[in-house]
A protein has these predicted regions:
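Intrinsic disorder/low-complexity segments
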Residues: 1-31, 222, 227, 315-332, ...
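Intrinsically disordered, low-complexity, mixed-charge
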Residues: 2-10, 28-217
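Conserved phosphate-binding/catalytic loops in two-lobed NTP-binding clefts
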Residues: 543-553, 765-766, 776, 782-806
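Short glycine-aspartate micro-motif
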Residues: 245, 452-454, 508, 568-572, ...
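Active-site histidine-anchored catalytic micro-motif
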Residues: 559-629, 637, 658, 666-667, ...
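A contiguous, well-structured pocket-lining segment that forms one wall/lid of small-molecule binding clefts
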Residues: 213-215, 457-487, 491-495, 625-765, ...
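Active-site-adjacent structural elements in enzyme catalytic cores
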Residues: 121-438, 447-508, 512-524
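Conserved phosphate/anionic-ligand binding catalytic regions in large, soluble enzymes, centered on
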Residues: 245-260, 352, 365-376, 512, ...
């Protein structure tokens, strides 16, 4: 946090809101006035009530107000009390507040005779942070399950410490009139809470109760109302018990839920949702229930119980569990929830609706996104009825509008700390604060830094908006494979700048010419140039277009997140990315330079992918390409023993490789994982991206420390030759060695490759990024080996190493160049 003391002439540069309604009086000679603006995530967290109570305790007069820049405070009294007030603003803030900076100045007193909360004002640039949705707090939970409380079993209970924020806010500043709660008029009791400084609902914008707030309804798949209020929830619970699929309108969108113990129900959900084998997440009624099925660490428990309440990827229990000395009976979860997967994505109820439903059921449920595969989740009940009626048997809906969707976030613990895999509910749109990781010449404090819109990648898309030193990263959008997904992407690209009244100076996009996000970047710039409506043509400049290489964006994201300076060696391993030479990169070592540029200092030996992108779903194609690169025409002899393909398919792929037709070159480590999984018989065809690589990771035998051989070919850039590794691997296959041993030796070899290249380059800072580093063992092994060699190693925590982090990296890399 930064504290800036301004001068009386310009106290922090902020313009005051209009004067409060408090009367003025004669000013004691020893009184001074303290003027403050607090920036950060300080709206929607009870910050103004906190300031009010603190001022009352210290008997200070003045006012506090939300502005589009943050929280504005004027307070006056004795200097020693003002200094105490200033210290306690910094140290005693509400639990969910994030204070980024405080600007303050001492002025002559004006004569306020009371302290009040003023109406919010729109003034200056919009720099206040929008808070994510927050999981239900313990105080609200007590009320929800207290039969004597007026909010007993009320599924929309909230206070200043919890409830919806990002999913309901329409504009800044954060006030009820700027949220989707604006049409719900508070009853007398709620109004009294809202205006009581001693109540935790003091200025809680979504405040509501059964008398005046939103309500539930249950619908048939034909849209007929079945029941209302609490009866609607019981209808949904009974449907789940009966093995039916329920579409539930949650905090940031719809979820599809079924009994996680009912194999037939889970299979039916897969069939209707067109989701063959990709794992489902499971919501448990309690932490004790999760412990019955899973081995969870202390950190994983904290994540599950946190205000963010993400899905946490944990290991399934290997033996019978005991809790408090008593044997715990595990739930018999359906096999098809996560087939052939030793891990399970688990979460706890995070909204009042989930808490009441899970109390009613008291068993785990599958809770997956309310959409068809590759489409965005539904947010409107009428749209959901159209899109999900072929999946759901019953709909549990409500009348609180969802302004923007936010899917469940996903994290896992790697190297003793959390790693984001999907950043959405609970985290978005909080910004990532970035400094200057490269020694780019300063533009000077008086020159405004460019505002950058980064539009991300094609898969696992998110977008980012850079304003000064903050980068606001959107919620997870997903793969841009359907028109519905692309429409959601376009809405987010418009929504994020609109919230902050941002005029875009630079649009950053990927270099891949066929990505929809890249085309959007070009169209955005072209449209801005051709129609600068409403702009002063003498001042306005069209936005620049910055195309950022895919893997360089990965490196920039990880450097920015860890706030490290160049030079640094980026190890970027993933499935695919458009390279500077027009080939498919994915096994890269990029040296970040002090001038904001990079050099490709090493990469994996290339091989061809017959059929191009089809290899993502058919690992056997990667295997054939690998064998052909290594053995030429003799590859077909090896393929008879290792690759499961029909003779017709083999003949077709052979022609592609020999004639180099639709068989692009790649250096991808992701495709190398796929090839190895195919060669050892684990997976010939995949139903979702990364499936073969995941199964190769899961197959690893824990106690094996041996590694396959490899060769480093000197040159510029250096080339990592996997040929010796594949020859040894095929020999192991011929000896009927177990897949567990082969997988372990393969993983260990990859970690050694990183160490050898890093030592040859001679760079102390090593950055691990790209989707391959979602692999827990690979990351932990690489980190351990690099540390053994006294190298400093960095990896992701707040931002996903996969393509969900690309937008952040694009914004950072573009800022270094502009």
């Amino acid at each position: 946090m930064e504290t800036i003391v301004g001068s009386p002439k310009n106290p922090g540069g902020a313009r005051s809101p209009s004067a409060p309604r408090t009367a003025r009086r004669a000013v004691p000679t020893k009184h001074k006035r303290l003027k403050m603006i607090v920036r950060g995530a300080v709206q929607g967290v009870g910050f103004r009530p906190f300031v009010y109570r603190l001022a009352a305790e210290l008997k200070l007069n003045g006012y506090v107000s939300n502005t589009t820049q943050g929280v504005f405070i004027e307070v006056e009294g004795r200097r020693n009390l003002l200094e105490q007030f200033q210290r306690r603003i910094e140290t005693g803030k509400p639990p969910h507040a994030i204070v980024q900076s405080i600007e303050s100045s001492f002025l002559d007193a004006s004569g306020y005779d009371a302290f009040e909360i003023c109406e919010s004002k729109e003034s200056g640039d919009k720099t206040a942070f929008i808070l994510p949705d927050i999981a239900t707090c313990i105080d609200c939970l007590r009320e929800i399950f207290d039969p004597n409380n007026r909010r007993f079993r009320y599924p929309f209970t909230n206070c200043t410490n919890c409830g919806p924020r990002f999913s309901i806010v329409e504009a800044l500043p954060y006030d009820r009139s700027n949220t989707s709660m604006k049409n719900f008029v508070m009853c007398r009791e709620c109004e009294a809470e809202y205006h009581d400084p001693l109540d935790r609902r003091f200025h809680a914008q979504p405040n509501a109760c059964p008398k005046c707030g939103p309500h539930l309804e249950s619908w048939s798949k034909d849209g007929e109302r079945i029941a209302m209020r609490d009866d609607a929830l019981r209808v949904a619970a009974n449907a789940v018990r009966a093995g039916q699929i329920v579409a539930l309108k949650g905090l940031g969108g719809f979820q599809l839920i079924v009994d996680a113990r009912n194999e037939a129900a889970v299979v039916r959900l897969r069939e209707r949702k067109h989701r063959e084998e990709k794992p489902f997440a499971v919501m448990y009624p309690s932490l004790a229930a999760i412990r019955a099925d899973c081995d969870i660490s202390e950190l994983e428990e904290r994540l599950l119980l946190s205000a963010e309440s993400p899905i946490v990827l944990v290991g399934r229990a290997r033996r019978a569990r005991r809790t408090d000395g008593l044997a715990v009976r595990p739930y018999q979860l359906a096999e098809s929830i996560a087939p052939r997967n030793p891990n399970l994505g688990v979460m706890l109820p995070y909204s009042p609706l989930h808490h009441v439903l899970m109390r009613e059921l008291n068993f785990p449920i599958v809770a997956t996104s309310g959409n068809l595969s590759d489409e965005p989740i539904c947010t409107d009940e009428h749209d959901a009825l159209l899109r999900l009626r072929g999946i759901a048997d019953v709909f549990l809906v409500h009348d609180r509008p969802i302004v923007r969707y936010a899917d469940d976030s996903v994290v896992r613990v790697i190297c003793g700390r959390e790693m984001m895999l999907r950043r959405a509910r609970g985290y978005a749109p909080l910004p990532i604060a970035v400094g200057r990781p490269c020694h780019v010449p300063s533009q000077g404090v008086s020159q405004k830094r460019p505002t950058i819109l980064a539009v991300g990648a094609h898969l696992k898309n998110s977008v980012a908006l850079k304003i000064d030193d903050n980068i606001f990263v959107s919620q997870h959008i997903g793969d841009l494979e359907t028109k519905e997904a692309y429409a959601a992407f376009c809405r987010t690209c418009a929504d994020l700048p609109r919230l902050y009244d941002a005029n875009i100076d630079v649009v950053a996009c990927d270099m891949h010419p066929d990505y929809l996000s890249t085309k959007y970047g070009h169209e955005f710039q072209t449209a801005a140039v051709s129609s600068p409506l409403g702009r002063d043509s003498a001042v306005w400049k069209p936005p620049l277009l910055e195309m950022v290489q895919h893997h360089w964006a990965h490196v920039a994201a990880c450097m920015a997140e860890n706030q490290i300076e160049a030079p640094a060696l980026g190890v970027v391993w993933d499935g695919t990315g458009y390279g500077l030479d027009g080939t498919i990169w994915g096994g890269e070592f990029l040296l970040a330079k002090r001038d904001g540029a990079f050099e490709r200092v090493a990469h994996f030996r290339q091989f061809r992918l017959p059929g191009g992108d089809r290899a993502i779903k058919e690992p056997c194609r990667s295997a054939l390409g690998l064998l052909y690169e290594l053995f030429g025409e003799q590859a077909w002899d090896f393929s008879q023993q290792t690759v499961d393909l029909s003779e017709k398919d083999k003949s077709l792929l052979e022609q592609m490789l020999e004639k180099q037709i639709n068989a692009p070159l790649t250096s991808s480590v992701g495709r190398l994982f796929d090839a190895v999984a195919s060669l050892i018989g684990l997976r010939q065809r995949a139903s979702f991206e990364g499936q073969a690589a995941m199964e190769l990771e899961f197959a690893r035998q824990l106690d094996v420390r041996d590694a396959y051989s490899f060769r480093i070919d000197q040159g510029t850039p250096m080339k990592i030759d996997w040929g010796p590794m594949i020859r040894e691997l095929l020999a192991d296959v011929g000896r009927k060695e177990s897949s567990g041993v082969i997988s372990a030796k393969f993983h260990n070899a990859l970690a050694e490759m990183i160490v050898v290249v890093a030592k040859k380059i001679g760079e102390q800072n090593v950055v691990l990024t790209g989707g391959c580093f979602q692999n827990r063992y690979l990351t932990e092994r690489a980190v351990a080996r690099l540390r053994e060699e006294n190298l400093r190693v960095y990896w992701h925590q707040q931002i996903a190493p996969n393509d969900g982090g690309i937008a952040l990296g694009q914004a950072v890399a573009a800022s270094w160049r502009t």
